[in-house]
Amino acid sequence: MAPVGSKRGVLERLNAGEVVIGDGGFVFALEKRGYVKAGPWTPEAAAEHPEAVRQLHREFLRAGSNVMQTFTFYASDDKLENRGNKLSFTGQQINEAACDLAREVANEGDALVAGGVSQTPSYLSCKSEEEVKKTFKKQLDVFIKKNVDLLIAEYFEHVEEAEWAVQVLKATGKPVAATLCIGPDGDMHGVIPGECAVRLVKAGADIVGVNCHFDPLTCVKTVAMMKAAVEKAGLKAHYMTQPLAYHTPDCSCQGFIDLPEFPFALEPRILTRWEMQQYAREAYKAGIRYIGGCCGFEPYHIRAVAEELSAERGFLPEASQKHGLWGSGLEMHTKPWVRARARRDYWEKLKPASGRPLCPSMSTPDGWGVTRGHAALMQQKEATTAEQLRPLFQQADAKH
């Protein structure tokens, strides 16, 4: 077990041209396992069910992850207490437990710990810059106490709020990454990806990119736009992408949360492990060196990324001991037609069927078009009432 501080830092690795592999999507994975509630998507499980969070960290580590992100997504006090969410633990307890779990597992391998903050109800409700930064600072105090290796501001729909987060995180002197949940159209205020990236780098981010909301190849395209703009501005940064594990060709600016299938019927859109290998290769070719995943990414997806880039990294992940590359393990199958699939060209050419003959291949995004400052996005501590839900149901029914 490597002691804290003895490992090479994330910037040292990236500056050397190495690939850093992130982890996957904790809130979706743990919701499916029964440890996170869909709706608030908050990370109480770090304190309530540490064994579940620890095991998922461990599976991502075995799959090839170099970074264990603390399970602190939506762990700001204002989000933890939003819309009637009831807590058995304080925000500080949840953040501390998440840091301890990430460090415990990171020390089982050559992995770093990243403390993460994300967008806040305070910003959506038009609170001041000072108030929003104070919210980030409360989480940051825990990350400093627990001596995380790097900091990530992730899942921001508005570059302005992400800038505020980066400014707070940068004051620590630790490496800072910043990822927006945007596609090629830019943030929810219409700021294009390139401008977003330049602003984040000027705010102090060492690593910039995107996470969530869109599929891998869309995210690679978006980060390529960021990279071009940063270089044109004469600035320097490293680049990262942690996309969805879902196909989103029909998504608009809001991404997958605008799809009618969100969040309980997305399974037909899941990428195969072979498509993840394509993602890893395209990201690498685009000059992206921090490559991970977000919602929908399971450990086998991360293993596919690590296997695709094994030549560049110089090794295979531990979990590949139980996985034949490009299906080669199928040589051992009892059925001859399955043994015939033990080859790369079979899986690369396959176009998987959904088995749903009455379902469309594309959806129409809801397209409500609301963002910061809209009455429907003003947040509250009290539970959502039936009176508040009724007009939302009516508006949704009118669209479908």
Swiss-Prot record:
PROSITE patterns the record matches: HCY (PS50970)
Transferase in keyword set: yes
Keyword set includes Cytoplasm: yes
Enzyme's top EC category: transferase
Reaction(s) catalysed (UniProt annotation): L-homocysteine + glycine betaine = N,N-dimethylglycine + L-methionine
Subcellular location: Cytoplasm
The gene coding this protein: bhmt
Assigned GO CC terms: cytosol
Species name: Danio rerio (Zebrafish)
Required cofactor(s): Zn(2+)
Subunit structure: Homotetramer.
A GO BP annotation: L-methionine salvage
UniProt-recorded name of the protein: Betaine--homocysteine S-methyltransferase 1
Pfam families in the record: S-methyl_trans
Binding note for cofactor: Binds 1 zinc ion per subunit.
Pathway: Amine and polyamine degradation; betaine degradation; sarcosine from betaine: step 1/2; Amino-acid biosynthesis; L-methionine biosynthesis via de novo pathway; L-methionine from L-homocysteine (BhmT route): step 1/1
Binding site for Zn(2+): 212, 294-295
Stated role: Involved in the regulation of homocysteine metabolism. Converts betaine and homocysteine to dimethylglycine and methionine, respectively. This reaction is also required for the irreversible oxidation of choline.
UniProt-recorded Gene Ontology molecular function terms: betaine-homocysteine S-methyltransferase activity; zinc ion binding
